[in-house]
A protein has these predicted regions:
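C-terminal catalytic domains of large/alpha subunits in multi-subunit enzymes
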Residues: 1-269
């Protein structure tokens, strides 16, 4: 939501900057481009004005600045000293304002896959490989999206195998410090393979969807499914620890555990 509001406000800001620069350069704003902080006439880079000067030109107090600013901000067309070059009804200053309210929510889509190893003796679980294919619409900043996915998967692995809040009968939290609250080490997070699809959303100007929770939400279910495939027993609660897996093995051997209806040897999920 905020990204689309920013985009709409920036478009207004750009239009305003081009109008002001067009008056200073005696050019049609439709013939102007902004490149590396400079407004220039398309096809004539010599006819240009820095964007910072455009910002000063839009300020009604521009003539209160120093002599250099005064020289840099003189219009080709004379104007009153207190009349900034903005369109009628616009506020002075190089600013843009807009509002955005989505017609309805957008939803990201994706697929997670994991390969795990469960030690036959200790029941320790190691995540060997993890892969994510994700579609959050148009990628505005691919590196940030990549970081969101990687960080989310790491958080999800912690929630699936390590992090657990333990309370006593009076409701007192017993593991309230990092001394006894388990979290995964970096060495316990596997290499995460990622790929991205871009299916723009038709519901907003930027065509974007969400990426914040897409890395973390599926992880527990995926790892549980992989453990089920390895052990052949139903996993119905997470996080899961080696001693819980060991007890499930004993229950399965005694015929007390819920059998898994999936054929053994299938590809881990």
């Amino acid at each position: 939501m905020s990204g689309n509001a920013i985009a709409l406000a920036c478009r207004k800001l750009r239009d305003k900057a081009l109008r002001i620069a067009g008056e200073a350069l005696e050019a049609d704003p439709r013939d102007l481009d902004i490149t590396d902080g400079v407004v220039h006439v398309r096809g004539n880079p010599e006819a240009a004005i820095p964007l910072r000067t455009v910002a000063v030109l839009s300020n009604p107090l521009r003539y209160a600045f120093d002599e250099e600013a005064k020289r840099a901000t003189q219009f080709a067309v004379a104007k009153p000293m207190d009349d900034p070059p903005v369109a009628p009804g616009e506020e002075p200053g190089l600013e843009g304002r807009d509002y955005y309210s989505p017609p309805r929510s957008t939803f990201a889509a994706g697929m997670h896959a994991a390969i795990v190893d469960v030690d036959p003796d200790t029941a320790e679980v190691r995540v060997l490989k993890y892969a994510v294919v994700h579609d959050c619409g148009r990628l505005i900043n691919p590196r940030i999206v990549e970081g969101q996915i990687h960080g989310g998967v790491a958080q999800g692995i912690g929630g699936a195998l390590y992090e657990r809040m333990v309370y006593d009968g009076a409701g007192q939290l017993l593991n309230a410090s990092f001394m006894d609250f388990l979290m995964p080490y970096a060495t316990e997070i596997p290499h995460i393979e990622t790929d991205h699809l871009e299916t723009p959303s038709p519901l907003n100007p930027l065509g974007i969807k969400g990426a914040g929770e897409a890395g973390v939400i599926p992880v527990s279910a995926v790892i549980a499914a992989a453990i089920e495939d390895a052990e052949g027993i139903r996993i119905d609660a997470m996080p899961i620890s080696p001693d819980e897996i060991f007890r499930l093995r004993l229950r399965a051997a005694a015929g007390d555990a819920e059998p898994l209806n999936r054929a053994r040897g299938s590809v881990p999920s």
